[in-house]
């Protein structure tokens, strides 16, 4: 099979890149080995919560503008403020078009979202039913918060969240109560209702009668004007519609919080992007992974100094049948997604054997204090790339292989709260670089073209 672009990885970076390529009319394929880290995510878009030195950030874009001078190795420094802003605006508009509106504060500042443990976490964009608390919590206008869960549901504990919220001094005037709700639908299922996860509950609540029962139960514990916090138990597609329906029935203000995995807020993003990709005519190769690639020298007369070119790749499911493309993007993630692996004394990129920006001493990979405020150095290690995010192998630049997302070096998404922002921005940048080179003459006019899907 031949494509204009093949993206290896089906997470935030890979799907962002794929959607932008399709918009420009490129014949695009995504190879996704399985569930991405979005199944474990909050569903909000973190652009920058802290600087690499650990200083809290209130205005991400203003702060990113200083990175070229203060943190020159950071992906944001390479991308620049203008590209990051363009990428995030594009992503917000794209997600709104495909049914998942994302909003931010009008003043350009981060906002706080509530975590399932009752902490406040800084983020940039959130989904419609994620309540946005101001960065200055003393300006919070909510007077009463009601934390409600489904009886027996293990992945959100209101009492624990309540105890932690009461530790936040700026919220000392906030009245916080908790409640458990039982559904009669539990009587009709074969399993113990304590075994149900968020996806199971979303299936039960797809029935209107069960939603009406839930709405009535919520009204017994809250009044209009209260902020009613519930676990994210409404899935993709109709999930947001169901939440609007319950708000209209109850006149309550609902706030979703992500649960322990699987997180339906994160899954909502992934499934919406994948569905849009297929609807636009993309080819999704699910449940497959790349095992190797074939390279050639760009300048065969001087191989020692020549750049490389990736000609084709081989996957586990397609065996000896290669996939070819003019351009490739590697967005396989970091250690969590097995985009990077580590052995006793070194780190490797397992598909192409790309060069890694890492310390030679294993003792430099980690902090001696496990809960160090500066996190662990290995989280900032990743692929060596050019300033245009082209991969490097054995010191040779690979002209047509770009890297995006968590596989990049020079930043710590956990410490900084920058994972989604870097993923979207670097994926968008890779797509823009590819589009500029290929400049297709023919654009897809029919958005209803169905994709070829290899299972």
From Swiss-Prot:
Catalytic activities: a quinone + sn-glycerol 3-phosphate = dihydroxyacetone phosphate + a quinol
Cited NCBIfam families: glycerol3P_GlpB, PRK05329.1-2, PRK05329.1-3
Disulfide topology: none
Family classification: Belongs to the anaerobic G-3-P dehydrogenase subunit B family.
Gene label: glpB
InterPro entries cross-referenced by the UniProt entry: FAD-dep_OxRdtase_2_FAD-bd (IPR003953), FAD/NAD-bd_sf (IPR036188), G3P_DH_GlpB_su (IPR009158), Metab_Enz_Cyan_OpOx_G3PDH (IPR051691)
Annotated protein name in UniProt: Anaerobic glycerol-3-phosphate dehydrogenase subunit B
Species the sequence originates in: Aliivibrio fischeri (strain MJ11) (Vibrio fischeri)
Keyword line: Flavoprotein, FMN, Oxidoreductase
Record's function text: Conversion of glycerol 3-phosphate to dihydroxyacetone. Uses fumarate or nitrate as electron acceptor.
